[in-house]
Amino acid sequence: MNWLEIAVHVCPEGIDMVSNIFDELGAGGVVIEDPALINRYIEANIWDHYEFPPEVLNRPQPIVKAYLPEGPNLENKLVLLQERLTGLPLDAVPTFERRQVAEEDWATAWMKYYKPVEIGQKLAVKPSWEDYVPEDGRIVLEMDPGMAFGCGNHPTTTMCMEYLEGIIQGGESVADVGTGTGILAITSAKLGAARVLAVDLDEVAVKVSQENVERNGVQDIVEVFHGNLLDKVESKVDVVIANIVANVIMILAPDVPRILKHGGYFITSGIIQFRAEEVRQKLEQTGFKILGRKEDGEWVSYLCILEG
């Protein structure tokens, strides 16, 4: 079977919007090539510049790629894609390119930019096909994203992992809502959490996260559920993680105290810069005290504590 690779050129603020459109079209997953993010990792000596072609490093804005199977409905999907891109609340309408790829190329296209990355002081993330031996005793997570979001090289994920390094001391209970690949749930378990609930609405994400949980040997600690975010969390926990988007965080915030212990931590991420103040106000109105704010490019993450 042949596939059509669709590459959408979009500003950083539109990456998640375009990803959601592809999900609606049935792509199942996306590849994000963000030159600003890649160059930050190169400057930090995490990645080597020779691993990336100049056209990627010098690109003026990110590209979001997806792969759709050729078939009778493909042209209709492309028309719908153009309509949805035109309707996005962005300063400029994203443009897209298309090219045919063979099945064997499609199956591995997303793998070439997924490299081992060290995060914070204690953690490292590697794909299963890369050799990596930590020199400083880091805890290594082996993650294959498949068709789910979150493999450790996106700022929203990285900032959450850095917060978890500081607050997981051992024995905590954690709820990860919108778990994606399960990376934050697995991070919590490997740092010493005693019990972790990982929830996602997406059945593909649930499947991928369960595979990653087993790959990392934490299936006795992490339970993965398919469900509506907080609905699956029945008892109070020490930490709640929500690496989603600003709108969903603000909807979730009033319900988080129901399942979070007093003095417990709420980590939020996936917040674009221009929504950060709005999210902060909502968190404080709900009874949270902001303990920390991290920024990375266009993204913001908050560490909060439930007072009372």
Curated annotation (Swiss-Prot):
Major localization listed first in the record, in broad terms: cytoplasm
EC number: 2.1.1.-
GO molecular function: protein-lysine N-methyltransferase activity
One Gene Ontology term from the biological process aspect of the record: methylation
Record CDD domains: AdoMet_MTases
Transferase is among the record's keywords: yes
The entry's keywords: Cytoplasm, Methyltransferase, S-adenosyl-L-methionine, Transferase
Pfam families on file: PrmA
Subcellular localization, as worded in the UniProt entry: Cytoplasm
Xref: InterPro entries: Ribosomal_L11_MeTrfase_PrmA (IPR050078), Ribosomal_PrmA_MeTrfase (IPR004498), SAM-dependent_MTases_sf (IPR029063)
Keyword ATP-binding carried by entry: no
Top-level taxon of the source organism: Bacteria
Binding site for S-adenosyl-L-methionine: T157, G178, D200, N243
Catalytic EC class: transferase
GO cellular component entries: cytoplasm
Catalysis: reaction(s): L-lysyl-[protein] + 3 S-adenosyl-L-methionine = N(6),N(6),N(6)-trimethyl-L-lysyl-[protein] + 3 S-adenosyl-L-homocysteine + 3 H(+)
HAMAP family with a match to the protein in the record: Methyltr_PrmA
UniProt family annotation: Belongs to the methyltransferase superfamily. PrmA family.
Described purpose of this protein according to its UniProt entry: Methylates ribosomal protein L11.
NCBIfam families linked to this entry: prmA
PANTHER family with a match to the protein in the record: ELECTRON TRANSFER FLAVOPROTEIN BETA SUBUNIT LYSINE METHYLTRANSFERASE (PTHR43648:SF1)
Entry protein name: Ribosomal protein L11 methyltransferase
Organism encoding this protein: Desulforamulus reducens (strain ATCC BAA-1160 / DSM 100696 / MI-1) (Desulfotomaculum reducens)
Gene name as annotated: prmA
